[in-house]
Amino acid sequence: MEGLCCGPGYASPSEAIRAPNEKLLYTIAIYTGTGIQKPDYLATIDVDPKSESYSKVVHRLEMPGIGDELHHMGWNACSSCHDDKSMSRRYLLVPGVRSNNICLLYTSPSPRDLLKSRMPSSA
């Protein structure tokens, strides 16, 4: 795609609109307030309309503890790094607002099957 740069983001909203559509979506699933005593998890959803598993949860990654209340996840590299070849979106940072745990999730080499890389404890 002409005009797009080499890093993990985009220089402008119009450049992002011209980019290829996402094929996977990561979303937080929490049990806070439900009475269910299970760990929160990150769900990977297939959003590629050409895929056989389109619109399905293709992977669930449970957190190690109960009651984290996962919130406001983000990438290790933001869109302002669009001109930096050395940057890539390899990790998702997912904090627990009730536990103060920060989960570092590895999205490469298999973005469908997230791995826990590091789970620093609040203790």
Indicate residue ranges for each PLM-predicted region:
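Short loop/turn segments immediately following the C-termini of beta-strands
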Residues: 30, 95-97
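Structural signature of eukaryotic scaffold interfaces centered on beta-propeller domains
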Residues: 2-20, 72-88
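Hydrophobic alpha-helical segments, chiefly the membrane-spanning helices
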Residues: 119-123
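Conserved small/polar residues in nucleotide/adenosyl-binding loops
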Residues: 106-111
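Beta-propeller blade signature
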Residues: 43-46
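Structural motif
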Residues: 36-41, 100-104
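Surface-exposed loop and turn segments in beta-propeller and other repeat-based domains
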Residues: 58-71
